[in-house]
Amino acid sequence: GSSGLIPFGRT
């Protein structure tokens, strides 16, 4: 998920 500070695979 890209719903964080950095668009990783986590939320």
From Swiss-Prot:
<keyword id="KW-0964">Secreted</keyword>
<protein>
    <recommendedName>
        <fullName>Periviscerokinin-1</fullName>
    </recommendedName>
</protein>
<dbReference type="InterPro" id="IPR013231">
    <property type="entry name" value="Periviscerokinin"/>
</dbReference>
<dbReference type="GO" id="GO:0005576">
    <property type="term" value="C:extracellular region"/>
</dbReference>
<comment type="similarity">
    <text>Belongs to the periviscerokinin family.</text>
</comment>
<feature type="modified residue" description="Threonine amide">
    <location>
        <position position="11"/>
    </location>
</feature>
<dbReference type="Pfam" id="PF08259">
    <property type="entry name" value="Periviscerokin"/>
</dbReference>
<comment type="function">
    <text>Mediates visceral muscle contractile activity (myotropic activity).</text>
</comment>
<keyword id="KW-0027">Amidation</keyword>
<dbReference type="GO" id="GO:0007218">
    <property type="term" value="P:neuropeptide signaling pathway"/>
</dbReference>
<keyword id="KW-0527">Neuropeptide</keyword>
